[in-house]
């Protein structure tokens, strides 16, 4: 049984690990994976058709804990302990819930002190006792007790007339004064762990199409002095098609991983693929997982030729590998009486809306099957790749965008060289 410390408006954890409000989803999953022998039977709950309409939940079924992540920014918003019989809880080092101590109204009063009068929810038949960043829900035994809990008669804990021994049914940790109005806080400095995160990514474009990326980056920078004085650093960097490896490294720092392409599975869809001369060396990616961005370099010139932006929607094969990339892409409208106008495509745009702005692709989509090995199937199904305006949109079956690949302009003279090949 887990023995955890409750910190209102902040966290739930122990000496080895801590679930902190504002923590990105990937870090919470990393904690669960590291301690999989202790924390077992974890479920990932999400809406398959409408992933933005409901919170993303990690359900620790064995331990009676639910971690609720904001559907948009994917940071931890609420920590719910839904079954207090499966976990030990303490506050300021003193237990208020264990096998020997029941979490009664008297015990909560002793451990946390007085607070504002509670609120009775007749629909749930639950009584909610609220502290700042912390709420307890008590189960009422019958509807006949409801009049005792009307707010007009509640002037403090002593006047609530909770039946002796009534115990907590649920506990919530959140940011602010109201559970209903709470939002996921900004990522705490303790969660950066030396990484740089992207607050936003703007796609820069010229007259012909995408030209590069402008990234607004966040880092936990600490100047001279103690780590406790660390502050959030916000800065902007730009990278462009044609930039060298050294340019990108100086702008964004070292990638988390370098991946060399062993084959190009999309090559067959290019003009005259059988005429292309096989390369002796392979193109390679810089994978920036916390930025949600991949950068592809040409094997011969070592210059940027593609950017890949990842949305990290649940139900996609690459889910939880990348932090969500909050991108904005200006689109050139292909409509009557809309010459010169632009609209913006974001991480949350749906493919139907993008098609209305850009026009329907001339060619049918390429169906993309992903699996960990040739003999395995992908439980999430295939995705569909559409090409428009030097961009490839990978579309999931629920109409959301899984990734966007941006292509640089063709190199001068490349068509001539291709035509001269035997």
Swiss-Prot record:
Keyword Cytoplasm: yes
Disulfide bond annotation, renumbered to this chain: none
Keywords: Cytoplasm
First and last residue of the signal peptide: none
InterPro entries: PHAF1, PHAF1/BROMI
GO terms under biological process: Golgi to plasma membrane protein transport
Compartments where found: Cytoplasm; Preautophagosomal structure
Statement: the UniProt record of this protein carries the keyword Mitochondrion: no
Annotated GO CC locations: dendrite; phagophore assembly site; synaptic vesicle membrane; trans-Golgi network
Subunit structure: Interacts with BCAS3; the interaction is requrired for the association with the phagophore.
Biological role stated in the UniProt entry: Plays a regulatory role in autophagic activity. In complex with BCAS3, associates with the autophagosome formation site during both non-selective and selective autophagy.
PANTHER family per record: PHAGOSOME ASSEMBLY FACTOR 1, UPF0183 PROTEIN
Family: Belongs to the PHAF1 family.
Protein name per the record: Phagosome assembly factor 1
Native source species: Homo sapiens (Human)
